[in-house]
Amino acid sequence: MEVARGENIRKRKFFDMDIPLNKGIKPISYKNIGINTLPKNNMSRKILFKDKISRDSISKDSLAKDNLSKSSMLKDDLTRDNSPKNGLIGKKRSAPLDISFQNMNSSMPSSTQKRTKILDEEIEDQSTSNENSPVIVDLTLKPSYMPKISRITEIIHKMKELNMNRIEDALPSNKKRNEYDDAKNILLQTMEMDEEDYEAENVVIEDSPYLNASLSEDDTDSSIVEVETDYSEEEKESMSESESSSDDESYSLYDSF
């Protein structure tokens, strides 16, 4: 096959080009590369192929097209610079509108302008006066959060006070704590010993003759003391009659039941 030199051939292979093979560089075989796919700039061609492609291996039409495109670009630039500026491109932008408070105040009515001036003066006075004054942080909270936080702060303050009192009066607090522990132990002991004491008291009541309600016959005989009295015969007869009448009444009542 003949080497294509400057002819208008759309596709060809690397081994058809006049690439020197003396330096041991093997051409890429059997890869079809279109000339239009190559970069248009000669420098980029040289970088891409490392000076292995000569001008003779590239068609003259493509180089002519490159030159024409460059010249047309330059002409377009010149015509744009010299053409009348009717479109947006090439126009000088107008300066942005000065949106300031003065312009806004000019559109406001006089009453609002006076108010804004007074407010501005007050703000300036406050800023100048607060330059050297201490910063006061306002810790006011919203009413919805006030109850919970107030309770928490109260609890914290109480805990702090208790801790401070304990630190300041260490010995009295220890004494109070010991007294409280002693009283607690005594109460527990009494609660535990109540049942045992109750059982022991019952045993003592059963054993002791002085506290027992059921007395024996000997005790009754010894405890009863007969006192002799001098009654007349008439009194004795009246006594016996009264006893007999009481017995008859008791029997009659018993029979009625």
Curated annotation (Swiss-Prot):
Biased composition (Polar residues) is annotated at 100-113
- Give the induction text: Expressed in the early phase of the viral replicative cycle.
Keyword Cytoplasm (UniProt): no
Keyword hit for Nucleus: no
Q: Where is the composition biased (Basic and acidic residues)?
A: 74-83
In its UniProt entry, the species of origin is given as African swine fever virus (isolate Pig/Kenya/KEN-50/1950) (ASFV)
Q: Write down what this protein is called.
A: Uncharacterized protein DP238L
Where is the sequence biased in composition, kind Acidic residues? 216-236
- Family stated for the protein in its record: Belongs to the asfivirus DP238L family.
Task: Provide the residue span(s) of the region labelled Disordered.
Answer: 74-115, 209-257
Keywords on record: Early protein
Instruction: Please give the superkingdom of this protein's source.
Output: Viruses
